[in-house]
Amino acid sequence: MVTLFSSMIPDILQQLYQRQLGSGGFAYWPGSPDANSWVSSMIGQFMVMASQNGYSVSKGVLASWARYQKKAVQDYRTNPDYPLWDFEQAYRLYTLALKGEPENGAMNRLKETENLSQQAGWMLASAYAVAGKKNIAKEMVANLRTDFAEYAESGRTFGSSPRDKAVALETDVLIDDIPAAMDIAQEVAKSMSRGWYMTQETAFASKAMAALAGKVNTGNISAE
């Protein structure tokens, strides 16, 4: 199964390239004239991870996406009408950190935002961890919860409480808090056993579980 999926990645990348707009962002639907913020972050993350795992990724597409992300980061303003607006910003920052181009100033500004959502807090902590600042990530996590209220969002971040728990799970893995990660992993597994799940839940849960398995199986756990 893994080999089959791996062989599909080059074709998937080619299909994703076709959704990139002149702005560097990516459309949710093929042919749409508008970039979707969350989808742009997801596709960017996929491209970065593919590149890090040895796949050939278009440098031009990736560079254009990075410029789009950085502009969106700088243009970000809080939006009281949409509570998870900060989560979108945190995801942008995470993807840029993953690419090795962290926007440290924007990360610090978002961290100091009053009433930062729990979802944004977890994702931003991941960004700090990926950027090599695990001490800051750990400080943030100490004040975050995992008891996300049940919800299912059909737009914006396409979120749900199981997806958000998966984000928290990966954050705990990144900061090497394996006991906490194991606890959340059980909750994520229970949520995913209900028989149906959203694409976001599958994507984030699979990635987080794989990260946890990698740490546990290799013993690659470091302390600062």
Q: Where are each of the predicted segments found?
A:
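Large, well-folded core regions of big proteins
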Residues: 1-224
